[in-house]
Amino acid sequence: MAENSTHSPREATPPAFCNKIVNKGQLKSLVHWAFTHYGTARTAEMADHLKDLGFRYATKAGVSISVDDLQVPPSKRRLLETAEEEIRVTEDRYTRGEITEVERFQKVIDTWNGTSEELKDEVVKNFKSNNPLNSVYMMAFSGARGNLSQVRQLVGMRGLMADPQGEIIDLPIKTNFREGLTVTEYIISSYGARKGLVDTALRTADSGYLTRRLVDVSQDVIIRELDCGTQRGIPVQSMTDGDRVLIPLANRLLGRVVLQEVVHPETGEVILPKNEAVSESIAKEIAKAGVEEVVVRSPLTCEAARSVCQHCYGWSLAHAHLVDTGEAVGIIAAQSIGEPGTQLTMRTFHTGGVFTGEVARQIRAPFNGKIKFPKKMRSRPFRTRHGEDALTAEVSTSLTLEGDDQTETFEITQNSTLLVKDGQAVKMGQMLAEVAAAGRNVRKTTEKATKDVASDLAGEVQFSNLVPEEKHDRQGNTTRIAPRGGLIWVLSGEVYNLPPGAEPTVKNDDYIEGEDVLAETKLVTEHGGVVRLPVQEEGKGGREVEIITASVLLDQAKVWLESLQGRDQYVIEAQKKQRFLLKAAPGTKVINGQVVAELIDDHYRTKTGGILKYAGVEVTKKGKAKQGYEVTQGGTLLWIAEESHEVNKDISLLLVEDGQYVEAGTEVVKDIFCQSNGVVEVTQKNDILREVLVKPGDLHLVDDPEAVKGKDQSLLNPGEELLPGLSTDELRYIECVTTPEGEAVLLRPVTEFPVPDQPSVPSQESINEAGRAICLKAVQRLPYKDGERVKSVEGVDLLRTQLVLEIDTDAPQIAADIEILPDEKDEEVSRLQLVILETLVIRRDVSADQTQGSTKTRLLVEEGQQIDPGAVVARTEIKAKQGGKVRGIRSGNEATRRILLMTDDDLITIETQGKATSASEGELLRAGDEVAAGVTVAESCQVIKVQDGQVTLRIARPYLVSPGAVLQIDDQDLVQRGDNLALLVFERTKTGDIIQGLPRIEELLEARKPKEMCTLAQRSGTCQVIYNDDDSIEVKIVEQDGTITDYPIGPGQNPIVLDGQTVEAGEAVTDGPLNPHDILEIYFRFHRETKGVYESALLSLQKVQNFLVNGVQSVYQSQGIDIADKHIEVVVRQMTSKVRIDDGGDTTMLPGELIDLYQVEQVNAAMSITGGAPAEYTPVLLGITKASLNTDSFISAASFQETTRVLTEAAIQGKSDWLRGLKENVIIGRLIPAGTGFNSYDDGGLGEPDPSFEGMPFTDDDDVIDDRTARNYNINDVKPFSGERPAYDPSKPGEQQRSMLGIDPAAVGDDTLIDDQVAEKLNANLEGDQ
């Protein structure tokens, strides 16, 4: 085929004759070939014809799917039987205690996985050989619809499913959709189905947002130059993963421009000269010649400012030509990476506990024969993940299989697993070895995982060759582990859980019958008292017994319900007609010091607010604001009344003045009238009237204010003179006031309220047990303190008399119940009683269940009986379900929680048929072991008794625990069925990378720091790995100059270097994902020691770029999606183009600024000419979001995210937007500078002034030019004024253009803004020209 695309269509070669089945792949290449040779129109026509052809034949053939087309391969049954047999053997090994729970699980999963794969191959084989024209087969394999995994579910088996936690369920779905699923299988399937739906929904959103960010970061990458003339490039090799080639070299080279000529490695002839693009045929030729690495030009190394040049980008993949200038390659790149995002899975199932790391390559025997090991083979025994014994090859070696007439040798690499022994006979298809993947990158990262081992039967635990060891961690917790592993036996028996406080009534080795009492619990009273048995409500659970330990009865007071203040309340009437209001409702509990009732009395009620003063009254110091202050000594309360009105209105509504004397009934504020004569006091703030006080009393004007000043706010006793001729006949309070008429004194009336020392209390009668005195005490409380001003319009209560419960006890938490009882003599009258009750709940009788026997409770007291503290009120007996021998009662001080009965159900007897028994008493036997010659036991057991001719065995189960397991039980413990015995700790390969698919791509492109990232070596040197006793590991690196650096290792990290190994700078020391920021920093530091800052920045950035490109590629490859490297490179270029200034030197740049690397370099070059200090900087890696927000264009950044922040910053810095990208232009509504619009803004007046441009005079008149005129600034449209157009001088683009337009170049700078009139004049010039 001719590859050269310069032919005109007529000369193009006709397609070569193709004798193949045209499936999807063939169709692709056919269309591609037509496209490169004949262009779009003719290809479209051809594709149309192909479509018609396809439909015509499909119709004629009648290709459709009916149920009969779903043919299940006949070998399915045989495969399932084999798998089930293998699993049965595994289960047997597990019940014998030969493998652990983890190994069993692993084996089951692997067996089913293998079966499922084998069946899939059978499906294909079956279709191919029996019915190649089957429509299902044709569809799936031509690539028209469906794929192998779907066909497998239709006619193979669905296989293993994961549960919602991502753990694999070890019950596979053995059926397919053709046969139909069982109910269980259907329900298992539904987890996965739901996950699929949710995943798809989330994926579209995620992928859309990724595309948006990508477009934003790379939208201004446009091909603006033909050749940037760079000398740098990147080496390209095939992309591999272990031994597998993911992307061959030929594919990666297609459409790239080579930097150096490609030379045939053997003949030395030049395959391709430099700066030439690699076409398909040349790519194949290069691959055939065996070239391993080609240095090509790449957008990553392109030196074009703010864009990529044509040569560095290479072919436009749509046309197989070099890309055109003005092509918006950034947007193409963004869409190429974003679009397949929907096809990536979000999270591959985290296959719970399943070691699906790299599946090791398996070697199977091609024929029957015998295995021979080489003489000097070094191997060590090894336990595989299925718990089988195998050998590990310590050095690379080979195996030989000798058959009857043929021999074959297999190469075995180091660390491979050998599943056969020397001289063993093997059958065809048997697995011989698992070969470890070779290569340095075989660092399988492992993580610790745990799995519970639960007991399958109740019984007694016995350790067999298991030595527990205690470990203390820093928090002081003790865990018991089995450092060397061993067996935990559970010997069968009926285990009874005892209720709390139960005491066994039997001893070990007692023999009891069914329904005998095993243990009993006593119900004991703590305080003693009078027994009261409440009436039982039908259907209620456990009975209660109440014991009254103390009570008090108000024997003279009557209680009745009365409606007060709109609700029903209990009123207590005592002697002397005192009436109390019950504050605590009947049936509630009250505690010591709580108010039970309050006296209804209005002796202490005032009419208005006022000031309260104590005279002789004493109160307790600590008063609670809520309850008031308790009176300790009586006396008199003095009350100086005053009215207070809270107003909070505008001052203009006030109708009186401050200090004015008013009569009762005067309107002081609009709609507010005073109730007494007195002086007005007004409080106001900011022209808002807060409150008005009216102070009643007699007002006397005084001539000499000083004479009364000393007596202000004191009391005037009756008959005492205040001023000559001014006295009073009752107690008054003196206050000096300022009135509109002048200074005056106000004598305010004082009301006296007497307070008695002891309030009267209703009589009470009480029964008290020892030390449980309980009574009601009357307490007087004052709500206000001495001198407090009380604001009120209605009036307040100055004193409250309350009945308070007093419990004289050392147990403060005791509460009393309030009860209302009918009187014994008179049914009509109710009395109030307070009782302290001890309530004991009697257990319900329960019938026996799995874990406990039946219980029976007997009550030992009767109603009204007086009992002492500590007396037994009731007994509960726990009975055995069936007869047996008692075991497991612990002697010593610890309480017995469980009792074991060894019943007949737990024993089996075996006849030895006269043969001598080989077992001894107490011996533990596993299923299949011999008791006597030729007599085996069906299940594992312990030998109890050996008699003539028969052996009595006790059923048991062994559980194997692996070394390092955490034990949850002790030797001789009793366990119920389902109790956890141990926690197996095992290592599993971390599945692939932490995450795959979209989240991983996002992590890479956003340059996120991964969790649990690995530690990298800072400099090259030799490792020292030290393993300490406490399981911690230290890694040190001795560098060339002898310095030793410590590398701390976090928890869960494993070193992947060996002692004495040499490492290079930037190599990983521990396992875990790489952090791109670390790579950049370490390589930059490393290169800075020997090279300049620019060179170091380029080299370190190139490392990171390489890492990111390969990272993104491998994710897409793992899902089988092909993306050309150049697209990823364009985006990565945008992420790695900036540096952070550390020190501005003599430049105008500020520390901390993010600036393009090439821009800083230009300024530094200028500095080196002028002799100024250059700027120092560090390269940075920005995620795509960060990079978008840091673009030169603030319009683009603001339209992406954080609009306000971006715009305010741009405004403060006075930024200008040069409108270089597509987005800015679209927002403003101009023609975009790509495609046909590319030339309309060609260089003319658009470039930023060169750094060398600094000396030119600018005239900047802040004039504005509008779009319509700005668009006409174009060299190409201008007719020269005189005959010849001056040759275009690229060194001074703007200047030359301006002179062509007849403008004085010196007068107008690149940044000058022109006003409309000038612009119109220019316009007229141009149009006149044309």
UniProtKB/Swiss-Prot annotation:
It catalyses: RNA(n) + a ribonucleoside 5'-triphosphate = RNA(n+1) + diphosphate. GO terms for biological process: DNA-templated transcription. One of its GO terms (cellular component) is DNA-directed RNA polymerase complex. Its EC number is 2.7.7.6. Residues 1275-1301 are annotated as: Disordered. Its cofactor is Zn(2+). One of its GO terms (molecular function) is zinc ion binding. InterPro entries: DNA-dir_RpoC2_beta_pp, DNA-dir_RpoC_beta_prime, RNA_pol_Rpb1_3, RNA_pol_Rpb1_3_sf, RNA_pol_Rpb1_4, RNA_pol_Rpb1_5, Rpb1_funnel_sf. It comes from the Bacteria. SUPFAM superfamilies: beta and beta-prime subunits of DNA dependent RNA-polymerase (SSF64484). Pfam families: RNA_pol_Rpb1_3 (PF04983), RNA_pol_Rpb1_4 (PF05000), RNA_pol_Rpb1_5 (PF04998). Binds 1 Zn(2+) ion per subunit. Keywords: DNA-directed RNA polymerase, Metal-binding, Nucleotidyltransferase, Transcription, Transferase, Zinc. The keyword Cytoplasm does not apply. Zn(2+) binds at C228, C302, C309, C312. DNA-dependent RNA polymerase catalyzes the transcription of DNA into RNA using the four ribonucleoside triphosphates as substrates. HAMAP family: RNApol_bact_RpoC2 (MF_01324). Belongs to the RNA polymerase beta' chain family. RpoC2 subfamily. In cyanobacteria the RNAP catalytic core is composed of 2 alpha, 1 beta, 1 beta', 1 gamma and 1 omega subunit. When a sigma factor is associated with the core the holoenzyme is formed, which can initiate transcription. This is DNA-directed RNA polymerase subunit beta'. It comes from Acaryochloris marina (strain MBIC 11017).
